[in-house]
Amino acid sequence: MAVNGKKTALLVFATLIAFAAGCGKSDWKDSSAIRIKLDVDSLLNGMSVSIDDIFQEIQLVCLDSSDMISNSVYSGHNHYTFDGEYFYVLDEKSFTIHVFDSHGKFVHSSSKKGRGPGEFTMATKICYNADLNTIDVLNPIGKIYHFRTKTLEYVSTLDIKGKDLQAIHDFVPTRSGYLLYSNTLDERIWHYDSENRIANPCGIRLPEYLSIYFYAQDRFYSMGESVQTFRAFDGKCFNLDSSLNVRTSLVWDFGKRSAQLKAIPELPSAREYHGFLMDYSDNHVAAFNDIKCIDRTLIANVIYKRNLHTIVYNLASNQAKMFLKTEEGLPLVCGLVYDNSMMLLVDSHMLPEFISTEVLDEVSVREYQKATSTGSMAIIRYGRSGVKP
């Protein structure tokens, strides 16, 4: 998958989100961190990788709807979610939430556009909140709307307050409240304490000269019971524990191919940063676009040699794979993780790029054919039965 043109604007614009060392109570020592040392050139020149080498099962579900839904696989996975029974897709333009059952059958749609209770004119993410059993929608002005699962009946609005916190661009529910990401402040990661109803910074900062950020797929991912965040220029991961202590949890070591913060110049525009990224990626793993963890297996999308590559690393066996595309000719792009599966929402006209009927069972092949013939969107579900060791 070449990273250029329109795909570049959507996939790479913001892969320089770089969380620099924090202050205060944070512990930035790497002694207890997982260190993953990889020779990317040897991995790419080694044996080809089959999608069956990674997942036990791949399923496809056609979303049975005649409505045109504005969404793209390249805009990330913040506009759809799953609660174990139903899919929810937030239309990025109409602010309508479409509900489908787990088999793709259309249930109903609910327009949320407006200025009344439970309505909004801006939204950057939809998310299932397992602790509250609600569907949460983030308005970047600092509001989170709670809706009942399935019916989407409005429940309440959380108005998040915090000193200097004026905009929120990503969030993830936690047992104590929410972790928040803001791209307009030096302090990027905040914790909202539901009990005290206040947001406080976690001590993760972005270097001032990198304040010109680009679009990133996601700022958070879960590993077991913990929530992780990462800095995109080198993939270093940080664990945010229940006491708000921030510790380095994982370090990627690509040797001479590792990106270095000191090599990234101060540039005046995103366009110039894009040009630098492409040039830098000729000899370095220049950026991490996304990281996900499924059943002790890390899946990371990285920019190397001007393309989006995928790294699959099993934390139990310490075995690694890296590829541009699988031997079936398929890219593997990070999606929404639920239990031991990863889900990717794909437009019908892009299905041939992301999935092949050769890797699907008979039921999924019929769903694929229905999606392509009707122009419907589809959900690709990878590894619902678990990830291979």
For the regions a protein language model found, what residue spans apply to each?
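Bacterial N-terminal signal peptides that target proteins for export
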Residues: 2-10
